[in-house]
Amino acid sequence: MILFTAIILVASVVHVVVSSPQQCYYCVEDDCETMSLWINQTCATSQRSLGTSHCGTAAVRYHEGYLGGVPLETTVKGCFDCTDKSAACFALAGLLKSSLGWVVQQCDINCCNDTNCNTNVTILSQNATNVLRRDAFGTTSCYECEESDNYTCILKQQSQTCRTSRAALGITHCSSAKVKTRNVLTGTVDVSFIRGCISCEDKKSACALLAGSFKFRKHATMLECDIECCNGSYCNDGAASLSKCFHCMEDDGLSCSARQQRQICSLDPESLGTTHCGSAVGRKRNQNGAIQNYFYRGCFDCSKKKEACFTLGGYWKGDVNAPGATTLLECELQCCDPNVINGSYCNVETPILKPAAITVFTPTVTGPAQCNVCLEKDETSCSENQQTQVCGIDPYSLGTTHCGSAVGRYRQSNGDMVYGFYRGCINCADKMAACAAVGGFRKNVQKWTQLQCEIECCTEDNCNTHTPRLVEVEQPNSAPRGEIHQLFRCTFVAVFIVFACFIVC
């Protein structure tokens, strides 16, 4: 039924069939009082055109924002689609809110269908359309976003205060909408996902508000509108059913708590898992060799804490903007389940570093001085292009105890499955932990999620000439970005960008 409303919207709000009139008089406010100040508006291409089927003269009563003073009245002339005059008024209200910040309370419009026929005067009548009410009760805040895909919209949604936000299109409801638009200049058809404050007494009017707003902001004519509305603060949370954790990285727990933000585990490119929220404390070494404390909160896969700590260590190692800036030495981790009732944001604990904390990278442990290093799609190209990595000093080295060769299967951020092959220095006493470290490493650099891998390790210089093989597991060709799985079966990964850095080094 929502889509049916959208199809009506195509015909009634933003009619796109070119017909008479091709242009109308356009003016706003005082300019409408003097005909010599009226300008010609081309209905098919003007940024402020609200249709192609009619010319119209609208009388509006408005406030300059929801917190403005006395109401003002003015006239607006231009191109409209007046098949449904109420929808035309809502479209005008959406355009004026986005362009001038006006909150249109009432609107009356008279229309005609000849070129520049809108020379008439319109006054507000008792039957004027009520549009955006300032005294309405409803929502105080909603989530706000506008992106080309739903996952990114959810990930980037921010708080919007309905009465003060310039982008808000009402104060009674929160909305989530998928709209299809056509750019009036290029003809490009785009799909957008939108959340925000809106007036949604009926969905057709709400879609008309969006149509007017889009016409000004995007120079685009709305073709379809599929909208859902609710009337509780933040009720349009796209992540309501998704696991969420607090996320921060600081020197101590107090600073982390003061600066922490929301992390959506299945969508955030920095998420280190989907099954748990965690708080970690420990020691790290910076690029100058200084030992420092750290405190971290975020999403984890914490069924095995050692692997979770190695994932964090590998993630920090993969910082290509600050190579070698963070080498994780010790890790004390506490985890909780965000999937239980009221479990989201459960990682509020402050663990204390204990003598038996998990050791991650051990730079002083002796092992091979150097290993073969490469990052390619398969073993053949890896062997052809491999270089030498000095384990103790290379900023991207993942250990000093072993040389390793790994093959893996990964999910890219767009959901596609890919394979990769890596050789390099690594701590490989525990293969599962080694896999976790490199999984975190690749997550930082390429935002890839590790699914499966096989790794073989050795302890002599440049001994990593192995060719491990994956045990095939049936996988879909692609998967939604909202689904992130970890099949830690000796998983190990690395990064193309890093390989370039190795060559430079």
UniProtKB/Swiss-Prot annotation:
Keywords: Membrane, Signal, Transmembrane, Transmembrane helix. Residues 505 are cytoplasmic. It comes from the Eukaryota. Residues 20-483 are extracellular. GO terms for cellular component: membrane. Component of the acid-insoluble and acid-soluble organic matrix of the aragonitic skeleton (at protein level). This is Uncharacterized skeletal organic matrix protein 2. Residues 1-19 form the signal peptide. It is a single-pass membrane protein. It is found in: Membrane. The chain crosses the membrane at residues 484-504.
